[in-house]
C-alpha cells in the first residue's frame, strides 16, 4: 500500500504542473482574443469584409463594415452571462438602429478567424433567393447575418466562464443594422455587379455610403406614400426612408 501511495503522489506531482501549464496556456490564448485589443478588432472587421466581398452570386449593395465600440460593449456585457440564448433586442440597440447577433461556444479558446469561419460555413446550405429547409439540424442564420448587405457596424466580445465545472468560451458579435429580416432572409443582399448600387462610394467591391438610420416599420414606403415624412409616425419610425436618399439602406 505504501508503494501504491507513493506512486500516486509521484503521479499527482507530475500531473499538477501539466494542468497548471494547460490552464496558463488557455488563459494566455484567451487574453490574446479579447476585443479591447486593436489588432483583434482589425482582424474581425477584415475577415468580415473579405467574406462579404466574395459572396456568390456577387452583391451590388454590400456595405463595408467598421468596428463599433458601442456594439462591442453591449456584446461584452451579454457575453459575461455565458448564455447561448439570444439576447433581448433592446440590450443590443444603438442610437438609430437595432443590432443582430451571432454566438458560438467552445471548450478552448480558438481564433476569431476560426469562429467566423464556422458561421460562414453555413453558406453551403444556403442558396441566394431560395428559402432554406426547415430541418432543425440546418441553420443559415449566422451566415446570412455576416453577409447582410445593410449591416455596416460590428462589435464583438469573448467571455471565459465555466459550465458544469468545465471551461467554456463564449464568442458574441453584434451586427448593426440587424439582419435576418424574416420577410427577406432568403435575399440578404441584392445581386449584381459589385458596387452597382453605389458607383460613387465604392471601395474594393464594397459600398461606403450606409444610411445610419433604420426603418422600424416594415412598410415605411407605404406609410410615407400616404402620410409623408412630416407625420409624427414616419418621423419616429421611418427615418431611413425619409432621411436617406442615395445611401444604402
From Swiss-Prot:
A cellular component term, taken from the record's GO annotations: extracellular space
Pfam families in the cross-refs: CAP (PF00188), Crisp (PF08562)
GO molecular function, one term: calcium channel regulator activity
UniProt keyword list: Disulfide bond, Glycoprotein, Signal
SCP domain span: 45-175
Stretch forming the signal peptide: 1-21
Family statement drawn from the similarity comment of this UniProt entry: Belongs to the CRISP family.
Functional summary from the UniProt entry: May have a role in sperm-egg fusion and maturation.
Protein name in the entry: Cysteine-rich secretory protein 1
Organism: Homo sapiens
Amino acid at each position: 500500500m505504501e508503494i501504491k501511495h507513493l506512486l500516486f503522489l509521484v503521479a499527482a506531482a507530475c500531473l499538477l504542473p501539466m494542468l497548471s501549464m494547460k490552464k496558463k496556456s488557455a488563459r494566455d490564448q484567451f487574453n490574446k482574443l479579447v476585443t479591447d485589443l486593436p489588432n483583434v478588432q482589425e482582424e474581425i472587421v477584415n475577415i468580415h469584409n473579405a467574406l462579404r466581398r466574395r459572396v456568390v452570386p456577387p452583391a451590388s449593395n454590400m456595405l463595408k463594415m467598421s468596428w463599433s465600440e458601442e456594439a462591442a460593449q453591449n456584446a461584452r456585457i451579454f457575453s459575461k452571462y455565458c448564455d447561448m440564448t439570444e439576447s433581448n433586442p433592446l440590450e443590443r440597440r444603438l442610437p438609430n438602429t437595432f443590432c443582430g447577433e451571432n454566438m458560438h461556444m467552445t471548450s478552448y479558446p480558438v481564433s476569431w478567424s476560426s469562429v467566423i469561419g464556422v458561421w460562414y460555413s453555413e453558406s453551403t446550405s444556403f442558396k441566394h433567393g431560395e428559402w432554406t429547409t426547415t430541418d432543425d439540424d440546418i441553420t443559415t442564420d449566422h451566415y446570412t447575418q455576416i453577409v447582410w448587405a445593410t449591416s455596416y457596424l460590428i462589435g464583438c466580445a469573448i467571455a471565459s466562464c465555466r459550465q458544469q465545472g468545465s471551461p467554456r468560451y463564449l464568442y458574441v458579435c453584434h451586427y448593426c443594422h440587424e439582419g435576418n429580416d424574416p420577410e427577406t432572409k432568403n435575399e440578404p443582399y441584392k445581386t449584381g455587379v459589385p458596387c452597382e448600387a453605389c458607383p460613387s462610394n465604392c471601395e474594393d467591391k464594397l459600398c461606403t455610403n450606409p444610411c445610419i438610420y433604420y426603418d422600424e416599420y416594415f412598410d415605411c414606403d407605404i406609410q410615407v406614400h400616404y402620410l409623408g415624412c412630416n407625420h409624427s409616425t414616419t418621423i419616429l419610425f421611418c427615418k431611413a426612408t425619409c432621411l436617406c436618399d442615395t445611401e444604402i439602406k
